[in-house]
Amino acid sequence: MNKLELQKVANEVRKGIITSVHAAKAGHPGGSLSAADIFTYLYFEEMNVDPKDTEKADRDRFVLSKGHTAPGLYSALAQKGYFPVEDLETLRHLGSYLQGHPDMKHIPGVDMSSGSLGQGISAAVGMAIAGKMDNADYRVYTLLGDGEIQEGQVWEASMMAGFRKLDNLVVIVDNNNLQIDGAIDEVCSPYPIDKKFEAFNFHVINIDGNDFDQIDAAFKEAKATKGMPTAIIAHTVKGKGVSFMENQVGWHGTAPNDEQYAVAMEELEKAGEALCQK
């Protein structure tokens, strides 16, 4: 896909996020929106995956370590064709397979259940080690939150990844600077993030995580990197794409009411129309 096509898909992903969280009356729109461009690039450009064959052995693996941003993952999966887009409106509903955190047993395309912060990267490291042991060609990607990396388990897993020289592993940090109870550097600062990963023998790339040119260049660089895992520090805007949600910590885990939903969808519809005119 070219940049414009990716932007169009990302806008649809954002619409799905807002629609699902509004329908659920609960969820995490802020971090889902900030990572929407990453989700889009992974599923529509980077990863070797097939919605018609979700268990194929050589597929690339993705672990959403910051599992609370499941609305973003679900919306990308729906756009890719893993399940109907209409099912997004069942998020968190009784009997729905789309619950608040990813469930590998019930959701097509989900490689690992997640939710407890810090654990997803460990699963991803294990998958990458297994790939090396099997001489398999697949790559493993995991998306972490910047607040999540306050968890010690993240660094235990990173130590192992660097030690094992897992060049089939890409760790992406959604660095939107906000977590549920405030700015991350005021709660428990993880900065400098890049220096920490470098200390564990990672190749580190800093990018604007809402810019497809930079996203594309970073993933190409990661694929060309040999002998060490890659960490992409994606500097993003929490709530990206919906003006009143951007950089507002209150939208970490709050669903829009009917009026806010209408405003958000109108903004995204206009953004989509503008992209179609390019």
Predicted segments, located by residue:
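Thiamine diphosphate
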Residues: 109, 113-116, 121-224
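N-terminal hydrophobic or amphipathic helices/low-complexity stretches enriched
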Residues: 1-13
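Glycine/aspartate-rich loop-and-adjacent alpha/beta segment that forms the canonical ThDP
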Residues: 212-278
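Cofactor-binding active-site loop characterized by glycine-rich and histidine/acidic residues
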Residues: 17-21, 32-163
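Short acidic, glycine/serine/threonine-rich loops at helix termini
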Residues: 74-75, 103, 153-155, 181-185, ...
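N-terminal capping segment at the start of a domain
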Residues: 10-26, 174-176
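Glycine-rich beta-alpha junction loops
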Residues: 68-69, 73, 176-177, 211, ...
